[in-house]
C-alpha cells in the first residue's frame, strides 16, 4: 500500500512562483493549504487565482506572517511547509521558523530559495546582502533542528528566456545581443512550473532531507552563446554579439541604480562566475533533482523559446 502523501502548507502561494507550487502540490495529490491574508480579495485577478486554488481542492487558510497565532495554527495542520515569499520578506521568515519550532510537528521545511546556492556564492553587492538574509534563514532553520530542503534552481525561465539570456534588454535581440563575459559559461534556465514540480516531489523524499536540491535539467543547462545560437537557428537571423568584459560588468553594477544593479550582479554570478553550474554536487550536502526524478517531463529551453516565434 502506498504511503499517505504529506499535508503541504504553502506560504506566499499567491506570488510569482508560489502559485505554481500550490498548483503542483494539489496536482501531485497532496492535501494542500495556502496561507492568505484575505480569502475574499477585492482585486479580480487575486480573487480568480484563489478560486482556481479552491477548484483544485486547495484549502485557503486566513492568516498572516506577522500574526504568530494564525501562523502557528496553520503550521500545526501541515507536515511540510514550503515558503515562496518574495525578496522583501526573506528575513521575516524567522517568524515562520519560530512558528514551526513552536508547533513541533513539521517534517520538512523549504525556506524561500529557488535561486543561487547562497552558501557557496561569491555574488557581489548589492545582491550579496539580499542573499545574506537567505543564509540567515538557513542557519536559523538548522539551529532550530527543523528538517529542511533548500531548493536551488538557477534562472526562472520567465525572467531569462524572453530576452534570450540578455540581462538588461527589454526583449529578444533585434540586431545585436549583449553578452556578459565571454558567453561560454554555462547557466541554468528552468520553467516555473517545473521548479514547483521538483520541489513538491522532494517534500516526502528522505533522500532530499537536510540537503540542497539542485534543480538543473540537463537540456536546460547551456551557455549564453549556445542560447543565442539556438535562437538564431529558430529565427533564421544572425545577431551581432557584444561581449562585456568582467571589469566593465563590475563597473556597471557599481554605477547602476536599484534594481538594475541587483539584476546585473545576479547575471555576473551566473554568466561570468559560473555559479549555477561550475561545481560538482557534494553528495553529503546536495542532490540533483534530475537524478532523483528522471521521469519528470520538463519544459526544455528549446521548447520554451518557441513561445516567442
From Swiss-Prot:
Gene3D superfamilies documented for this protein: NAD(P)-binding Rossmann-like Domain, UDP-galactose 4-epimerase, domain 1
Protein name listed in UniProt: Isoflavone reductase homolog IRL
Family from the record: Belongs to the NmrA-type oxidoreductase family. Isoflavone reductase subfamily.
Superkingdom of this protein's organism: Eukaryota
Protein keywords: Alkaloid metabolism, Cytoplasm, NADP, Oxidoreductase, Stress response
EC number: 1.3.1.-
Subcellular localization, as worded in the UniProt entry: Cytoplasm
Gene Ontology biological-process annotations: alkaloid metabolic process; cellular response to sulfur starvation
Induction: By sulfur deprivation.
Family annotation (PANTHER family): ISOFLAVONE REDUCTASE HOMOLOG IRL, PINORESINOL REDUCTASE-RELATED
Assembly: Monomer.
Any single GO CC term annotated in Swiss-Prot or TrEMBL for this entry: cytoplasm
UniProt function note: Reductase that may be involved in a late step of alkaloid biosynthesis.
Pathway involvement of the protein, from the record: Alkaloid biosynthesis
